[in-house]
Amino acid sequence: MRKLSVLLLCTLLCPVLLWGCTGQSADEYAGETITDLKEGDPSAFSRLLDAGLEESGADFVIQCPEEVKEPYLKFLQAAFASIEFEVASASERSDDVYSVPITYTPIDLAQTVGAANEETAADPPSADFTETMLAVLEADTKLVADDPVYGAETTTDLTVSRTDDSFSIAEEDLQSFLASALSGYMTPYDTFGALYDMQDFLTSYLDASFKGEVAQFALHTDRTEDEAYEWYLADTFDPPADLSQAYVARYQAAMQNLLKQSSYTVGTPRLEPGLFSYQIDVTITPNNSLADAYHEFEQGTYYSIDEASEALVAALEKYAAAPTYGAETTLTVPVNMETLSTADQEGSDMATLATTILPSP
């Protein structure tokens, strides 16, 4: 009976003894998790990237291209792999819940890649947002491996829980830890997202102003599409004060059609030193139709307001149907807080852009 009791006791204790001998501790699990983050599937950084894109995306209308996400995850993993971590012994907080201190020196990605990104943004390699981001992330991934810049040493406590025979790290703790270790990790996207979002804004501004295509402009300006369309109609199509009422509707329709014939292409912005400052080349084929219509109208002699009104509207309709253009030209437009705040003032940079696209009579 005693021998049987001893055997039974050994049978019961054996799993516990084996756990103590070969089982994993909470701090070992934390260390292996860090190694997996450095060497395993980069998709482990997906939640961190998604959170960063959501926060940065609140400032942009354009969205992160899907093709950019995988290289961005590899960039984050390369940055994380450059950091040395010291895992201290775990302390038990409560039953099967442990605190594991991790000491490390975070990489400062704003300092590591920021200057190189701004230099690239001053002369972007492509007019395409995706192509530029792919090139930038390739260069930045090399930078974090070759010349990383670090911040001040810090310690993060990870909460590690044991369930049955496995451990897990609290997801909130893990994401906070990754964000702390990768300070400024959205620097590439913030730099170039702002650049190409500005290109999209200026294009949408011109499309709304000249063509009445307001959907994208509404997004950029926090308007509804109806509000943006009212902005488009305001003042622009007011007829001359002495135009006969019978010709007002035709005048407005002719003007809208004439403006829609305007031709321009907004180039890739170039970042300038300072906050929110860009230079943008706009390639324009001047729409001379309005000036030519008025010139033709002014050659005639009219003996009544109705006769003059009919002639003016007829000239506008003629050139709206068969527009005339000048020689292609490129205008460099500075875009910053000052130029945007003075856009509706005569002689401003934005007003000059408008009159280059559609010369006044």
Model regions: which residues?
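Core segments of small alpha/beta cavity-forming domains
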Residues: 22-82, 86, 181-257, 264-265
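A broadly structural signal marking compact, well-ordered functional cores
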Residues: 24, 225-361
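Intrinsically disordered, low-complexity segments enriched in polar/charged residues with Gly/Pro
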Residues: 74-77, 144-148, 253-256, 319-322
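Positively charged n-region of N-terminal signal peptides that target proteins for export
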Residues: 1-12
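Short beta-strand edge/turn micro-motifs at domain boundaries
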Residues: 120-135, 141-193, 300-307, 314, ...
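C-terminal motif of bacterial Sec signal peptides marking the signal peptidase cleavage site
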Residues: 18-20
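Surface-exposed, charged secondary-structure patches
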Residues: 67-137, 246-312
